[in-house]
């Protein structure tokens, strides 16, 4: 069994796996539309983490992990707990970055619009402000954003995830503005 990571599963791999491959899935786009009250925010002041939205022209880069033989159900149970808060699973085709490796099926966790933590679309400025101000048990929401942006940049330098990188730029501008105010 393979699982596709497109958010924190890319850079916070706290589960056993047998193999991993960089690649992408199609027909989706990555968006910071999922609320987080258990990791990057708190009830009443949620952070924002990524989910996938259907997009016929979309392409999302990430990492596929092969779960260890004989431990698939145990690891999946852990991931089900980690990805609680409104995520459902589906199966999609994964296209490895290495063109000599054939595409194959992966399990995908998606925060759907009918879950209680789904925040949905908002102006990028508003999303950036929410990320800038949010923190939860797993840390600051800015850390999540920056780790994800850096991971995508390192794994797939040619990828131009406009939503992700535009948010990163807006949040960094806010951080620089706050530092400049502290120097006055």
Swiss-Prot record:
**This protein's record includes keyword Mitochondrion:** no
* Gene3D superfamilies referenced in this protein's UniProt entry, alphabetically: Gamma-glutamyl cyclotransferase-like (3.10.490.10)
The catalytic activity of this protein is classed by the Enzyme Commission as 4.3.2.7
The Gene Ontology CC terms held by the record are: cytoplasm; cytosol
* Record CDD domains: GGCT_like (cd06661)
Location within or outside the cell = Cytoplasm, Cytosol
Is Cell membrane found in the keyword set?
Answer: no
Q: Which domain of life is it from?
A: Eukaryota
Instruction: Please give one Gene Ontology molecular function term for this protein.
Output: glutathione specific gamma-glutamylcyclotransferase activity
Q: Where does substrate bind?
A: 3-8
The processes (GO biological process) annotated in the record are: glutathione biosynthetic process; glutathione catabolic process
The reactions it catalyses are: glutathione = L-cysteinylglycine + 5-oxo-L-proline
Which keywords describe this protein according to UniProt? Cytoplasm, Lyase
Please give one Pfam family short name.
Answer: ChaC
Active-site residues per Swiss-Prot or TrEMBL entry: 83
Q: Which PANTHER family match?
A: CATION TRANSPORT PROTEIN CHAC-RELATED, GLUTATHIONE-SPECIFIC GAMMA-GLUTAMYLCYCLOTRANSFERASE 2
Concerning its family, UniProt says: Belongs to the gamma-glutamylcyclotransferase family. ChaC subfamily.
Protein role: Catalyzes the cleavage of glutathione into 5-oxo-L-proline and a Cys-Gly dipeptide. Acts specifically on glutathione, but not on other gamma-glutamyl peptides.
Q: How does it assemble?
A: Monomer.
Entry protein name = Glutathione-specific gamma-glutamylcyclotransferase 2
Biological source species = Homo sapiens (Human)
């Amino acid at each position: 069994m393979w699982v596709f990571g497109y958010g924190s599963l890319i850079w916070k791999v706290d589960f056993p796996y047998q193999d991993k491959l960089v690649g992408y899935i199609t027909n989706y786009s990555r968006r910071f539309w999922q609320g987080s009250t258990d990791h990057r925010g708190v009830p009443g002041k949620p952070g924002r983490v990524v989910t996938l939205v259907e997009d016929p022209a979309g392409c999302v880069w990430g990492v596929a992990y092969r779960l260890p033989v004989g431990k698939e159900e145990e690891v999946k149970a852990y991931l089900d707990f980690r990805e609680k808060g409104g995520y459902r699973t589906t199966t999609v085709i994964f296209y490895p970055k290495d063109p000599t490796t054939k595409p194959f099926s992966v399990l995908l966790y998606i925060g759907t619009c009918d879950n209680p933590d789904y925040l949905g679309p908002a102006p990028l400025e508003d999303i950036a402000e929410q990320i800038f101000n949010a923190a939860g048990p797993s840390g600051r929401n800015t850390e999540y954003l920056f780790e994800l942006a850096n991971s995508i940049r390192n794994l797939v330098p040619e990828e131009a995830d406009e939503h992700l990188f535009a948010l990163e730029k807006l949040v960094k501008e806010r951080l620089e503005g706050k530092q400049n105010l502290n120097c006055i």
